[in-house]
Amino acid sequence: MALANPCLDFCLGIFGTGLWSVLDNLCVLKRGKPPVAWLATEKIFMTLKSVRPKKFLGQHFLKDQNVAKAIADTVDACPDIPVLEVGPGMGVLTQYLLPKKRETKVVEIDFESVAYLREEYPQLEENIIEDDFLKMHLEHTFGGRPFVLTGNYPYNISSQIFFKMLDYRELIPCCTGMIQKEVAERLAAKPGCKAYGILSVLVQLWYDVEYLFTVEPGVFNPPPKVKSAVIRMTRNEATSCGCDERLLRRVVKTTFNQRRKMMRGSLKPLFAQLDQEQGRTAGGHADFLAQPLLTKRPEQLSVQDFIDLTNAVEQEMKG
């Protein structure tokens, strides 16, 4: 295949395909964006009609059309609002979102994927956002309008994506897509399950979670070492969590970070922090820590139990 840049053609003649590894290493420095000196070669990648998955970006490109269509169909549960796809890669999912005739934007950090999408999906030109999703101000994405979040999410940031979703929950009534099976199980887990943890409680506080189906590694390039799963999360009717949400997050994270301890043991460090923040002498919470609920471990508490516990901790600190 003839290349569009004679300088790069010459370099390839000397270094062979190893040059691509050099380019990859350079791109690591810019989180998926090329150094300025290589910007002029962007069109070269467009001529290759392919994008090589990058491990440092957690890319595993979906190649099964049936799975892609099934994921695209999950957004139908929340009709009549725009769609934002995270990490479209080569557009395997995108191609099934576009015919739905809904305003669709994609956010992609990898410059090579962006170049490919511009070439293969010219109708997306104005709706390709070249950015890091985790750093975006989502209120500007659709002018403050609610939207569906979807994607074949990069495995290395999937949990971070859902924590960001929680921060923008008023704008995201529905979130669907594919993630590691382990993360999907954590999202959908109920009290008493080994998978039940921080993500389970904080997400289920605001969303109803559905584990839709499991996906085998062979439908990806490259195949991941783990199975994947498709999930759908739909905002529940809660308008308030019923407690101080910041304190709730601290209670949940503190206790699950010591999940093998009973609640009374895992809460002691939190009370020490709260006492210090309020300028109080540490200790003095023995009666509170003696209540029966705190003989349980965190995975035994429901979302409502954590809400009630947070309110009780707040009252204890006011006493």
Task: Name every feature range the model reports, one short phrase each.
Residues 31, 37-254, 299, 308-311, ...:
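Catalytic cores of RNA-modifying enzymes
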Residues 13-18, 32:
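Residue-identity detector for glycine
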Residues 235, 254-319:
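C-terminal lobe and adjacent flexible extensions of AdoMet/dcAdoMet transferase-like proteins
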Residues 2-4, 17, 37-41:
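Ala/Thr-enriched low-complexity intrinsically disordered regions
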Residues 6, 24, 32-37:
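Intrinsic disorder/low-complexity segments
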